[in-house]
Amino acid sequence: MADNTLKEKTSKGLFWGAVSHGTTQVLNLLFGIFLARKLTKADYGILAVISIFTLVAGCIQSAGFSQALANMKKPTHNDYNAVFWFNILAGSAMYGVLFLCAPLIAMFFHQPILVEVSRFTFLAFLISAFGIVPNAYLWINLRNRELAIANFFGLVISGCTGIWMAYHGFAYWSLAWQQVIYITVVNIIRYYYTRWIPTLPVDFSPIRRMFKFSVKLLITNILTTINQKVLTFVFGRIFHIDTVGVYNQADKWNATGSSFISNTINQVAQPVLAAVNDDEQREKRVFRKMTRFTAFLSFPAMFGLAMVGHEFIVITITDYWVSCVPLLQILSIGGAFLPFYILHQNMAISHGRSDLYLYCTIGQIIVQLGIILLFSHWGITTMVIAYSIFTILYLFVWQIVTSPLSHITIWQSLKDILPFLFIAACCMGGTYMTTRSITSLPLLLAVRIIVAASLYFLVLRLLHAEILNECLQFAKNKIKKN
């Protein structure tokens, strides 16, 4: 009974997570097309170079307490309340520091306009401090339907505002306002669904209990954020702001695809793994199924993006951005492996081993920085190739480190991953070769998507792939219920 209940909650969580992040990516795609057609490379570059500061500050204010709450069997109001007030204090302090540092940031990147833009954009993480607890409550209880609705309305309202501002000459300010409005709307809707209200006085003793676990996550999350944005940061220092904008555009579309799978998995991974970590065999079954599901989605999506990258960019955001296509294709290959990182990270966290998460991330950053410095004189394309190859290879390190927790060998992981990798690669390669003669870009894009998706589906059906059959059965059950 417990297995069935967990399976049902996991299926619902994955379904609504997929709906939420699928909708998010579609809306981001639509709004991104309109904005990229109006804004310049420099506009995107300006917001890109300060994104690392916003994300790091966001990590500091949340301090890993959302994951700490998820590891509790039944967190109380006192636990949530302590985390809320800590987030407010940390967020306010961080905003004050960054507000004062804005002139230094502008000086570092040789962009005086960053003073005003950064001070306004940094409001986004201050506002987000108010929504961390409601978000954690919905996430812990696998209420992904409500999270999906909040994200939908946040994207629609902020996206429409950004487009209106872009078409009325506000340039990079349209991107800044889009970020601030999005998090404001999302927070309001999260509070509507949770009806959670902070109280005074506040008892910070839960923070002290969670601190040992959370501080390692805090450091790890900061390092992970730096790791994800280090290329943008380095490029912002050594290349022209237009080049940063080109890379940012490629990275944005790559992240749109990769984060759909990563965020869908992340919605359920830690709560589910934490629920079964006292049963070794059950946990092993759950983890391997999540691995197969990730491979089933990630490889066709990301290899497909690499295949259609040229026609997709030219059709959607015009040939003004065609220089980002090679970078997008390279990043997409490496991006296919990033969702597996999420699984291993959540395995470590669900066992309370945030130290493993920390050490792996530190090692990743050290090697990655070395690679960037080594290839920095070879140009942006070579740096991105080296970065993507390293991303693929470092997955083996995560597998080795988490193996004592999951009791899953490298060979077992390869058996779960490689079939989908080879099938997706062959389907995309075959589609690419057989459609090269089509000269119309819109027709080429449509034909490649249809042929590749159909071919992938047919091959999996012929091979009786269990994960495909389960997805189809779940879809049938949802249709019958409705």
Please provide the spans of the model-predicted regions.
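Interhelical loop/hinge segments that connect adjacent transmembrane helices in multipass membrane
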Residues: 1-6, 10, 145, 188-233, ...
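Transmembrane helical elements of multi-pass membrane transporters/channels
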Residues: 13-28, 175-182, 186, 190, ...
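Hydrophobic alpha-helical transmembrane segments
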Residues: 115-122, 149-195, 209-213, 249-251, ...
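Signature of the first transmembrane helix
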Residues: 6-65, 89-102, 124, 154-163, ...
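N-terminal membrane topogenesis motif
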Residues: 1-29, 67-70, 74-85, 114, ...
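Membrane-proximal transmembrane or re-entrant/amphipathic helices at the cytosolic face
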Residues: 2, 403, 408-410, 417, ...
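Membrane-interface junctions at transmembrane-helix termini in multi-pass inner-membrane proteins
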Residues: 7, 11, 68-77, 127-150, ...
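Specific pore-lining/lateral-gate transmembrane helices of multi-pass inner-membrane transport
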Residues: 71-87, 246-362
